[in-house]
């Protein structure tokens, strides 16, 4: 019983010393870490999606971003992208009616300008 208490006490003391050493080491490395983060490109942390709301009048570029296709995509690719996105965002399955309307508007805009 006494040896267990001593072992636990030594373990706690060792953890305390290790934590103190780690904090001191981090203080010395702080300028280097800041320099590394400043040298990274700003887009590294921006995420992989378009940040911004919808434009008042939908453009071809915005429609392509919504559907995830090229602005010059053919009708088959536009239909496939529309179907895939609507399966995920359909209002009958808990999706937003506003988002569904924007997806449909994007499909209509791109299909009107796409080649067969």
From Swiss-Prot:
**Which Pfam families does the annotation name?**
DnaJ
UniProt xrefs under InterPro entries:
DnaJ_domain (IPR001623), J_dom_sf (IPR036869)
Topology Mitochondrial intermembrane: residue spans: 2-3
Membrane topology listed for this record: Single-pass membrane protein
Q: Which GO terms describe its molecular function?
A: ATPase activator activity
Q: Where is the J domain?
A: 62-116
Q: What is this protein called?
A: Mitochondrial import inner membrane translocase subunit TIM14
According to its UniProt entry, this protein's organism is Bos taurus (Bovine)
């Amino acid at each position: 019983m006494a040896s267990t208490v001593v072992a636990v006490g030594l373990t706690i003391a060792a953890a305390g010393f290790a934590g103190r050493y780690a904090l001191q080491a981090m203080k010395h490395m702080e300028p280097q870490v800041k320099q590394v983060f400043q040298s990274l490109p700003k887009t590294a942390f921006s995420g992989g999606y378009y940040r911004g709301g919808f434009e008042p009048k939908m453009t071809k570029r915005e429609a392509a971003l919504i559907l995830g296709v090229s602005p010059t995509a053919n009708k088959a690719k536009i239909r496939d992208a529309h179907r895939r996105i609507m399966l995920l965002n359909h209002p009958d399955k808990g999706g937003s009616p506003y988002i569904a309307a924007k997806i449909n508007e994007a499909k209509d805009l791109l299909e009107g300008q796409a080649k067969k």
